Amino acid sequence: MARGPSLDTFISAADRALRALFAPPTAARPVPAPGPAAAREAQKTSDSALTPEEKRESAALMRVNHAGEVAAQALYHAQAMFARDGEVREFMLQAAREETDHLAWCETRLEELGSRPSVLNPLWYAGSFGIGTVAAMLGDRASLGFVAETERQVEGHLKSHLDLLPDADLRSRAIVEAMRHDEVGHGQHAQSAGGMRLPGPIRELMRQTARVMTHTAYRF
């Protein structure tokens, strides 16, 4: 019979939550930069060349992405905390570490654009931690299936942002593309590790929940 989380695990979870919400995130990987051809163009088109409207749009979209990464931290931490299998737990923790890079990249970009993260990040974290806990309690296959479906939806969301970001904002576009690549990898790993396909109503509920967060974080 699997043992429940220890007191140290709960303390560690609280520490991770405080770090995700209030401490500057530290990335293990550098902020993605445009490719060689795009980089040459980027030297001609700096942030100062973006119109005020383009800057506001980029900032709003990157704020949404930052909020999504806060939620991802909570989901992965909760699912790792209640995972039955050690390999599943390690996968969740490794994915959370990669999502920390995303969090740091988005925060850096928001600062460059003169903007800020969502003021509702504590709400996104708390809600996502609860959702991740429920998914993990249903068993590792359900938890992995939840990751696979979440990342599939996130990939679609990031692809839509590549269509919405101003063409001249090459820096934001490079960050979003690198994030998308990682999310695809997480989803594929979860699926190959035995993740079950979630029922249609659950997938739709996930879409609607993400839509609420996206629309709210865009503004606040």
In which residue ranges do the predicted regions lie?
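Non-heme di-metal
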Residues: 1-220
